Curated annotation (Swiss-Prot):
Subcellular location: Prospore membrane
Organism: Candida glabrata (strain ATCC 2001 / BCRC 20586 / JCM 3761 / NBRC 0622 / NRRL Y-65 / CBS 138) (Yeast)
Similarity remark: Belongs to the SMA2 family.
First and last residue of the signal peptide: none
Protein name (database record): Spore membrane assembly protein 2
Function: Involved in spore and ascus formation. Required for the efficient assembly of the precursors of the prospore membrane to a continuous prospore membrane.
Sequence ranges on the Cytoplasmic membrane side: 1-6, 251-261, 346-366
Spans traversing the lipid bilayer: 7-27, 230-250, 262-282, 325-345
Length: 366
């Protein structure tokens, strides 16, 4: 009976520890298409063209993707070369179509079109980098068009992502160095008859490159932070199990309660950092959304949207919170409630002399 009472608090702690660990499982969804392709995304993203800059950009990218799709077919890369329907619009690379929905998680993403999931794939250590995901989607679709990579489309997807990262780094260095030359080369590439508008375009494209590069770096950091958090969570469960094992041999201990408090504190710091980083990242993606209120006010006031300063922003994405983020919030609440229980259990089963100041034990004996 005494042993049963001893384990009541530990059972509650173990239940909460296992619960918070199991709540990490949805983070691994959205990464495979085989079997049952479950997906509980942190957020959902679709392409929008809310400004003149993004309209020009998306239109140019669509034309380029159409060109390389035709190129892949005409050069005999496609096994469907004899099929005349291969040239239909729905068979070409459609990454930047506005009816696509990308469901993004920590370790992978799913692409959904017209309400149907087309595929789910792992995203490596790129994490939730939205622009990198769009590049990977281009590679995956080209891989399906080409006969050489039809059985392993990820090869071309990985290659394009690697090329994208290299190109982004090179473009960032180019724009940074060109800034010291008064944007001489940038003006040659992006110049128009309207010189003030040309300078604005240069600044906007430089801003776009900076945002894209920042997304790459931040998401790599967030990926490894989250991986470390899951590892710490598993280690904490092991510590709880070890704590329960030593309780069999006695009620009061020294080392295991300290380990329990240590792992619990580290887990809380790690989960808080990861949780806040995800919130900040979602907030950053919200900045890439079009501000419909400003657009409406401009139209009501009789202004032409193309002449508005807001129309030059990178309003490229529309982001909504996914079910995976809701699960993450619930997991974080469980961890916050679990931390006080960790310290209560550890202090309850710690040897009494560990709490006494030096010399107190001798006074008690006297």
């Amino acid at each position: 009976m005494l042993i049963v009472k001893r384990f009541i608090l530990w059972v509650l702690l173990f239940f909460m520890a296992i619960t918070q660990l199991l709540l990490y499982l949805p983070d691994f969804s959205c990464s495979i298409s085989t079997g049952l392709p479950l997906c509980t995304p942190q957020f959902n993203v679709n392409i929008v063209t809310g400004s003149r800059t993004t309209k020009d950009f998306v239109s140019s990218v669509r034309q380029f993707l159409r060109l390389i799709s035709y190129l892949a077919i005409d050069m005999g890369w496609s096994k469907y070369l004899a099929d005349p329907h291969i040239y239909n619009e729905e068979n070409l690379v459609d990454t930047f179509d506005t009816d696509n929905l990308f469901k993004i998680n920590y370790f992978g993403f799913c692409k959904k079109t017209s309400g149907k999931t087309k595929y789910c794939v792992a995203n490596g250590d790129c994490g939730m980098d939205v622009l990198g995901i769009l590049v990977r989607d281009v590679g995956l679709q080209l891989g399906r068009l080409t006969q050489r990579y039809e059985n392993n489309t990820r090869i071309l997807g990985d290659s394009l992502v690697f090329t994208y990262h290299l190109g982004l780094s090179s473009m960032r260095k180019f724009l940074r160095n060109d800034n010291y030359r008064n944007n001489a080369f940038s003006k040659l590439l992006l110049a128009t008859d309207d010189q003030p508008y040309s300078n604005t375009r240069i600044k906007n494209y430089a801003k776009g490159v900076t945002v894209a590069y920042t997304l790459v770096v931040v998401n790599k950091i967030m990926f490894y932070m989250h991986l470390a958090e899951i590892t710490i969570s598993a280690a904490f469960v092991v510590a709880v199990l070890g704590f329960g094992f030593v309780l069999i041999f006695g009620k009061h201990h020294t080392i295991m309660p300290l380990l329990l408090k240590g792992w619990g504190s580290v887990l809380m710091v790690s989960s808080t950092s990861s949780y806040l980083a995800t919130i900040v990242y979602l907030g950053t993606l919200k900045l890439l959304e079009p501000t419909e209120m400003l657009d409406t006010q401009s139209q009501v006031a009789g202004h032409v949207l193309n002449n508005d300063t807001h129309s030059n922003n990178w309003d490229l994405l529309q982001t909504t919170v996914g079910s995976g983020f809701v699960i993450s919030c619930f997991r974080y609440i469980v961890q916050c409630l679990m931390l006080p229980l960790v310290f209560i259990a550890a202090n309850r089963y710690t040897k009494a002399k560990d709490f006494l100041p030096a010399g107190t034990e001798e006074l008690i004996k006297v």
